[in-house]
A protein has these predicted regions:
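Bacterial N-terminal signal peptides
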Residues: 1-6
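Catalytic metal-binding/acid-base residues of hydrolase active sites
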Residues: 33-34, 193, 200, 236-238
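His/Asp/Glu-rich, glycine-adjacent segments
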Residues: 77-202, 292-293, 298-302, 384-396
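Metal-dependent active-site segment of extracytoplasmic phospho-/sulfohydrolases and closely related
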Residues: 26-27, 45, 210-257, 328
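Extreme N-terminal starter segment of soluble prokaryotic enzymes
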Residues: 21-25
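Active-site neighborhoods of enzymes that stabilize oxyanions during catalysis
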Residues: 266-398
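Short, structured active-site-proximal loop/turn typified by the sulfatase FGly-forming signature C/S-X-P-X-R
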Residues: 36-81, 123
Length: 400
């Protein structure tokens, strides 16, 4: 296939011309796919895309967890606009911790809604059922192996367990089936699970086998849709962590009690990470406690920074109504979550994310006819933000 990507574009063109009404779009979000996973694996298809398309290592959004980044990619907006600030959040109206899994929580239009407005049919495939609950708006169909209908089981076969690498292969087969049997679909969004990355380091043979297989599926996707643009990025990488703090217990034992500590990493996939992540939102009992609580937190081993809500909003573009009074940032080997004791040494096999140390990911743009300038793609969420727009936005031709 002759690559069509033009990487010398210096100004934004009409977004309708950029995407081209006839050119299909395939977005693949490889969950947990940091650059080290790419470089340590045999992935000839991605190697080809890197050489013949646009490739960059870009910044992902904080907290470096799936919901924040997936929603940002799917809306082309920052969390301050779409409202998703973690896999979980503290609902101040009900005073309870809740999972962010409902589409009503997403406050910005999805790329699927934008595409639908231009007459483009779209389909969402995700290994994780939480994604099809969070981001289905505008899709013709949203498919997850966790909730696969009998129709899809008849087509692809029984869905593997969510805690497996095989579940990603099932997902790719389902996407390929759709490409081969429904030529009217113009936008595909494919989101894998990072269970293999939580389980295996990038140098492990199991990880290399998994990613080589994923690469072979991407080759088949390009063969099935040779005229489509293919956009690939990730939400975060995954790294070993050696220490976890229960910040509620740690603060209580140091005479600076708090209302609650929320791990934005926490979701229903407990086996992935036990709910531990590299950031935490701290809700105070009283605003007058801020200084004392922050001092306690800064004294804990493995805490890089403790910042106020105002600083977190400005620095990470978060929605203030959905984060705590303080935000705690861990170092490269420390995570936060609920424990039976105030801290726990984690085993050598434990891997997670959520911190700044997992917020660099690869980005590939291949076969796009008129993309924006390469400088535009400074963050992962911008990979498709320029598509299906009604008006040319000044941000399309400038990096942030």
């Amino acid at each position: 296939m002759s690559p069509l990507l033009l990487i010398t574009v210096t100004r934004a063109q009409s977004p309708q011309k950029q995407s081209g009404p006839a050119q299909k779009v395939i977005i693949i979000m490889l969950d947990g796919f940091g650059e080290e996973y790419y470089r340590m694996s045999d992935m000839p298809t991605l190697n080809y895309m890197e050489r013949h398309g646009l490739f960059k290592v870009v910044t992902s959004l904080m907290p470096s967890v799936t919901n924040v980044n997936n929603t940002s990619i799917c809306t082309g907006e920052l969390p301050e606009k779409h409202g998703i600030t973690g896999n979980s959040f503290y609902n101040t109206a009900t005073s309870t911790e809740e999972f962010m899994e409902e589409d009503s929580l997403v406050l910005a239009p999805t790329i699927f809604e934008r595409a639908k407005g231009k007459g483009v049919r779209s389909i969402l495939f995700s290994s994780k059922k939480k994604t099809i609950g969070l981001l289905p708006r505008g899709t013709e169909e949203a498919i997850s192996p966790e909730t696969a209908s009998q129709k899809w089981i008849d087509r692809i076969g029984p869905a593997p367990d969510i805690y497996s690498r095989e579940v990603n292969y099932w997902l790719m087969k389902a996407a390929l089936y759709s490409m081969e049997h429904d030529p009217g679909i113009g936008l595909f969004y494919i989101h894998t699970t990072d269970y293999p990355m939580h389980t295996w380091a990038p140098e492990s043979q199991e990880s290399k086998e998994h990613l080589h297989k994923i690469d072979s599926f991407i080759a088949r996707i390009i063969k099935a849709e040779p005229d489509a643009m293919v956009l690939i990025t990730a939400d975060h990488t995954v790294k070993h962590k050696s220490l976890c703090w229960d910040l509620e217990k740690a603060c209580l034992s140091r005479n600076t009690p708090i209302k609650i500590a929320i791990s934005p990493e926490r979701d229903k996939y407990f086996k992935h990470h036990r709910g531990f992540g590299g950031t935490s939102y701290i809700y105070l009992r009283d605003t007058g406690d801020r200084s004392a609580v922050a001092q306690t937190l800064r004294g804990l081993k493995g805490v890089d920074e403790v910042i106020t809500k105002q600083v977190a909003v400005q620095r990470f573009h978060l929605m203030p109504e959905r984060i705590g009074d303080l935000m705690v940032l861990g170092d490269s080997t420390t995570v936060f979550g609920d424990l039976d004791t105030e801290s726990e040494a984690l085993p050598a096999t434990y891997r997670s994310h959520g911190s700044l140390y997992e917020a660099k990911v690869p980005l590939f743009i291949y076969n796009a006819t008129h993309p924006p300038s390469p400088d535009f793609f400074s963050y992962n969420y911008k990979i498709a933000s320029w598509l299906y727009q009604d008006l040319t936005r000044s941000s399309i031709s400038h990096s942030e």
